[in-house]
Design a protein with these regions (language model features):
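Conserved AMP-binding/adenylate-forming core of the ANL superfamily
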Residues: 24, 44-96, 100-104, 121-126, ...
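Structural core segment of the AMP-binding/adenylate-forming
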Residues: 111-188, 521-523
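Conserved pre-ATP/AMP-binding loop-to-beta segment of ANL
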Residues: 25, 40-43, 166-167, 172, ...
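AMP-binding/adenylate-forming catalytic core of the ANL superfamily
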Residues: 120-130, 137-139, 303, 427, ...
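Conserved AMP-binding/adenylate-forming
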Residues: 331, 338, 342-357, 361-463, ...
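Adenylate-forming
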Residues: 139-153, 258, 284-287, 300-345, ...
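N-lobe entry segment of adenylate-forming
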Residues: 1-62, 66-81, 171-173, 532
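Conserved AMP-binding/adenylation subdomain of ANL enzymes
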Residues: 236-253, 261-302, 316-317
Length: 573
């Protein structure tokens, strides 16, 4: 038994949060078994419609009973090679039915899941596997033109802790011969013996909600990715944010286009599905034609999408006119500031409410829903500021979280409108600390130092407005400029498809503003035209870009975040 990932939070915190009803003895595997008992033969999970193009197999559709049976059989396969409580299982799989099964099977045994994006190659996998001491690794035999199981087998000797490597896929997708040391497993119905053995194991050694359930990874946009262990406690608390804001219920059909490797995919889609017992439709990798087709074919009621995609779709009325969107009632978006015209456009033209999310693997969860902010412009710009007197919000976590803004220079709490400061949070959604010997991310009062810069807004200070990552601020002549604000405005230009704002080094001013953009087809853009467009937005002159760079694409990591450090490096060069 690996004890390294057990008992993440101190007893005093567990006692406090359980006494307040924020945490309970419930674990993820218990939630799954409860849904199976209630839902039975109802549809649970659906494969990507284009699965045959990705792996060669036919898409699958499973009921809750079928899903449970295959989960039990897979758990038996893990158990047979000695995997158990506290072991870390590296997972690199696309969004399929089998990925759902791997997670649920591992958690039924107390195994810690560490998911990695499909885009990661041997270098990234080796680094994270050794950081987290993977005991086993599960992937797929093929994905497009890649052979992931073969890739892992080739670096196995460089991961001393790795005892087992699995290729998990339907029998039709498993090759006749796998690389040496790779065990092939296929979905199959559980035997009565496997069912009874798992029942005994769960009864005699149940999961502890304070034990690690996952080790996800920070995006590595600023430095080496950090491991983020999270227990059942934090996951089951934070999932209420992404259930309450879109008001997800058992009758919903969720379309998941985000890789299930971090907060966006796991908490944005997977856990709301599991907690409510609705239908989960998987999608991967992103393909706009398939995505829109799934919305129509599966009668999807809720999905998530990045702001750039929503803006692009809104500008292409002919594309949307060809799709039946009548079932779709809301869309989640976020990670970067939303453009008010985009949020307003979806609401006014299609009656679809866009929900603004801001989250992190560590446990940030700010959200603006139509229930709390009916005005789409407010919803794009602001988040509820929890704890303000005489203001109540619709989500459970708004009553659970403590939120502060702190001046990054003086360390003093900020209470006035319009003063930028670092967001710091405390509450039942927040993790216990990074994997390994990392500096503590918490301040002297136990609040998570997020590194995100916000300001208080609203007539009564009831809102928070995101400005930018602290490390991304451009400081021009002593004035702080938030790239995110500029990016949101530049993205409204009809020629701009994608944008990142960075600071160019300057000997006199310290930094000057540079805009790096990609353009829409058959458009052009000059710096003077962009500056004129921004002047019409009535922004301060010191924020205006002094350099415009046009690229074919912007560098992004595996989860879609722009790698500004690469843009800065090329700017310096």
């Amino acid at each position: 038994m690996n004890k390294a990932h057990r008992g993440l939070h101190p007893r005093v915190k567990v006692d406090e949060y359980t006494s307040k009803g924020w945490w309970s003895d419930e674990t993820i595997d218990q939630v799954f078994r409860a849904q199976v008992r209630v839902r039975g033969d109802e549809l649970a999970v659906v494969d990507p419609a284009n699965r045959s193009e990705l792996s060669g197999g036919d898409p699958r559709r499973l009921s809750w009973n079928q899903l449970e049976s295959e989960v039990i059989a897979l758990a038996a396969g893990f158990s047979e090679v000695g995997l158990g409580r506290g072991d870390v299982l590296g997972v690199q799989m696309p969004n399929t039915v089998e990925l759902v099964e791997v997670y649920l099977a591992a958690w039924s045994l107390g195994i810690v899941v560490s998911p990695l994006p499909m885009q990661y190659r041997e270098r990234e996998v080796e680094g994270m596997a050794n950081q987290a001491a993977f005991a086993a690794f599960v992937t797929v035999p093929s994905f497009g033109d890649r052979l992931p199981a073969t890739e892992i087998a080739a670096i196995r000797s460089r991961i001393p802790s790795l005892r087992s490597v699995f290729a998990y896929a339907p029998a039709s997708e498993l090759p006749a011969q796998l690389p040496a040391g790779v065990v092939g497993l296929s979905p199959r119905a559980a035997t009565e013996t496997q069912r009874s053995e798992l029942d005994v194991r769960i009864t005699e050694d149940p999961n502890n909600p304070n034990d690690a359930m996952t080790i996800c990874w920070t995006s590595g946009t600023e430095s080496e990715p950090k491991g983020v262990p999270r227990s059942h406690y934090e996951w089951l608390a934070i999932c209420w944010a992404t259930i309450d804001a879109p008001d997800i219920g058992v009758g919903d059909v969720l379309l998941n286009p985000f890789p299930m490797v971090n907060m966006a995919g796991i908490n944005g889609m997977f856990l709301p599905w599991l907690r409510t017992g609705c239908v989960l439709v998987q999608h991967h990798p992103f393909d706009l034609r398939v995505f829109l087709g799934q919305i129509e074919a599966e009668r999807v009621t809720y999905t998530v999408a990045p702001p750039a995609l929503l803006w692009m779709l809104l500008a292409d009325e002919s594309m949307l006119a060809a799709v039946d969107l009548s079932s779709l009632t809301r869309i989640g978006s976020g990670s970067v500031p939303l453009q008010p015209p985009m949020v307003r456009g979806w609401q006014e033209r299609y009656g679809i409410g866009v929900i603004n999310f801001f989250g992190s693997n560590e446990g940030i969860s700010l959200l603006s829903s139509p229930a709390d902010m009916p005005d789409p412009d407010d919803r794009a710009r602001y988040f509820p500021r929890f704890g303000v007197e005489n203001f109540r919000w619709s989500t459970r976590i708004s009553d659970w979280m403590d939120v502060r803004l702190v001046d990054v220079v003086t360390g003093e709490d900020i209470t006035e409108v319009g003063h930028p400061g670092e967001l710091r949070i405390s509450g039942p959604t927040v993790f216990a600390g990074y994997l390994g010997d990392r500096p503590s991310p918490f301040d002297e009062r136990g609040f998570l130092c997020t590194g995100d810069i916000f300001e208080i807004a609203g007539d009564h200070g009831q809102f928070l407005r995101y400005l930018d990552r602290g490390k991304d601020l451009v400081i021009r002549g002593g004035m702080n400029i938030a790239p995110a604000e500029l990016e949101g405005l530049i993205a409204e230009h009809p020629a701009v498809a994608d944008v990142a704002v960075i600071g160019d080094p300057d000997e006199v001013l310290g930094e000057r503003v540079a805009a790096v953009v990609t353009l829409r087809p058959e458009t052009e853009l000059e710096l003077d035209a962009l500056v004129a467009f921004l002047k019409d937005k009535r922004i301060a002159s010191y924020k205006l870009p002094e350099r415009l760079e046009i690229r074919k694409e912007l560098p992004r990591n595996s989860t879609g975040k722009i790698l500004k450090r690469e843009l800065r490096q090329k700017s310096v060069a």
